[in-house]
Each structure stands twice: as structure tokens, then as C-alpha cells.
């Protein structure tokens, strides 16, 4: 099985725009825990998503309430306890 992957599109947004998260190569029809870390290094409460029958889930992040700066995202496959790599996106004024 391939290592879980997370892709962020786009990687730079103006405050108020959306960021799209695509998670692939997770265990199908199970749960994954998505982590979002603020620019100051503190983490929001993780969000649990259910993967589809291909081991994928997709999520939109609304940047309206996010701070200006660079955020990190990674996702844990709860069935295997394997983490994706960390990916980043930046919110600009």
C-alpha cells in the first residue's frame, strides 16, 4: 500500500479564499484524522474524516477566520497509524 498523501491547492491564498485538501492512499472506508497547525505552532482541534472506497477524502478550508501566515497540514490514517507528510499553505492579506 502506498504511503498516505495530502495535497493542498492552492498553496497561497488571500484571506477569505478557500484552500482545498485532497487526501489519497489512505485505508478505504475507514477514518483519518486531519491536523492543522497555526503559524504560531499551536494546533487546532483535529478533524476526523471518513475515507471513500478508494481511500480518499476531500475537504475545503475557509481561510476567513485564519491568521495571516503559514499553516501546516498532515493527516493520520487511523487504521494504520501512518501519517502523511506535512504540507503547507500560506494565508496573505
Please provide the spans of the model-predicted regions.
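Extracytoplasmic/secretory-pathway segments with low complexity and glycosylation-like composition
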Residues: 1-93
